[in-house]
């Protein structure tokens, strides 16, 4: 028989033992019940009596079958940080790293002290000639020189020039520089300043023929800062020519030039393949008794 059947049989016997006194209770008289109550032992179906003393421990049972491994538990909370450990020994030097990129340029340092003077260097090559300086002030008239040799039959003193421009639209109220020399007899015209400077006192004739385009033209002939003649020509959309001429009595050192006398009316036009603008002057005759006259 199996253990289960043994246990079932034992329980059945216990229940049967409890049921027999209860079944006999109706058949017993009052006498019999009184005897039971007075001194007889209590039956199972009567009221429970006091708890009896514990029985002796039973023999240990056999070990059960090992159960399955449970699921892993959840991670517990992190513990507090431990105390800092002692410093370890210094390790061996590492390998040399790659060269870094060049850093930004630093600020200029303070100027250092002047070093000792070096030896004299080799002489350099001569430089280019500088631009001509400004014309100096006119000097005092010198004393008369000794009489020169006779030049009977020779011509009188000469002074004549004819010049042209090489740029368009000159600035107003300044001498126009006619820098293309066609003739400069005696060298009395200064191309750098645009002025004719009288060296032979006498009567002179001056004339000009100016080409204009795209702008109006207001030009005048100036003698020692004063306008002697003025010419105005309006722009018609085509090339045009403005002309003027006069005769002047000049003394030694007098200056004559052309200039624009009104703002934004400087229509003088230069075209090397089409037209020229000319300024011309020459001596008609010198004053009597002039030392330059032969």
Curated annotation (Swiss-Prot):
The keyword Secreted applies. The keyword Signal applies. Pfam families: C1q, Collagen. Keywords: Collagen, Secreted, Signal. The gene is C1qtnf2. This is Complement C1q tumor necrosis factor-related protein 2. Residues 50-59 have a biased composition (Pro residues). It is found in: Secreted.
């Amino acid at each position: 028989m199996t253990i289960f059947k043994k246990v079932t049989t034992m329980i059945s016997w216990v229940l049967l033992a409890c049921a027999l006194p209860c079944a006999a209770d109706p058949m017993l008289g009052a006498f019999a019940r009184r005897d039971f109550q007075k001194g007889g032992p209590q039956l199972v179906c009567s009221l429970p009596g006091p708890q009896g003393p514990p029985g002796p421990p039973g023999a240990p049972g056999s070990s059960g079958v090992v159960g399955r491994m449970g699921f892993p538990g959840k991670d517990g909370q992190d513990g507090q940080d431990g105390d800092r450990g002692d410093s370890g020994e210094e390790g061996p030097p590492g390998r040399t790293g790659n060269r870094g990129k060049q850093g930004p340029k630093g600020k200029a340092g303070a100027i250092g002290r002047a070093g000792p003077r070096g030896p004299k260097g080799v002489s350099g090559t001569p430089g280019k000639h500088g631009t001509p300086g400004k014309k100096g002030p006119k000097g005092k008239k010198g004393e008369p020189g000794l009489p020169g040799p006779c030049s009977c039959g020779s011509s009188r003193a000469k002074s004549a020039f004819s010049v042209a421009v090489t740029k368009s639209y000159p600035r107003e109220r300044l001498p126009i520089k006619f820098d293309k020399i066609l003739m400069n007899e005696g060298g009395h015209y200064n191309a750098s300043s645009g002025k004719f400077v009288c060296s032979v006192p006498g009567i002179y004739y001056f004339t000009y023929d100016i080409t204009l385009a795209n702008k109006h033209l207001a030009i005048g002939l100036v003698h020692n800062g004063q306008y002697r003649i003025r010419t105005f020509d309006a722009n018609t959309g085509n090339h045009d020519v403005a002309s003027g001429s006069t005769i002047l009595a000049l003394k030694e050192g007098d200056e004559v030039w052309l200039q624009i006398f009104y703002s934004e009316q400087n229509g003088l036009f230069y075209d090397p393949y089409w037209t020229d603008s000319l300024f011309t002057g020459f001596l008609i005759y010198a004053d009597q008794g002039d030392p330059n006259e032969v």
